[in-house]
Amino acid sequence: LEQWHVDDLPVLERSNTPEMTVFLGGPESDQQIVTRHAKFLHLWETGDARMFRIRSASATAPVGSVGYWKKRWRDKDVYETGWSVHTAHQGHGIAARALAECLQHAADTGDRHQVFAFPRTDNSASNALCRRTGFDLAGEADFEYPKGHPIRVNEWMFDLRALRSSSRPAQP
């Protein structure tokens, strides 16, 4: 993973296809993509999010994005995570490796204990990714994404404390 950079707008543009956004309400306008890119950069500067471009040895350009951001959920301060791996690079374990690395980053540098993911209940690939990456299914929830578009999601939770305890040396 590499920190989101000013030159990463094409990563979002390549993710903005009908196939890639079927569970996200469909493609965004060009202006919405530019706004999202600016938001990724701004949120990194403010410390409210950490967005990354995903690199793969099999491609010269980034193959997607992953990140986490601060969220208030069920009266707790948590992180939410999201990801996107370009169609040609799906099915090769890239998303699982990127999400695991993203979670480790949150554990190493973040100040919250839980990360949540909210894939639509019918998004079998993203739900399988959550399961495979070690998230626990907490239930279902009603969401709006994009705003004004109600969806039903699975509520997956990952406890960062497990990563923190395994990545720190044992005390004598």
Task: Name each model feature, range by range.
Residues 42-48:
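Short loop/turn motifs at secondary-structure junctions and domain boundaries
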Residues 1-18, 22, 51-172:
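Acyl-donor (CoA/ACP) binding surface of acyl/acetyltransferases
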Residues 39-42, 144:
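Short, P/G- and charge-enriched loop/turn segments at secondary-structure junctions
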Residues 20-39, 50:
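Conserved GNAT-fold acetyl-CoA-binding loop/helix
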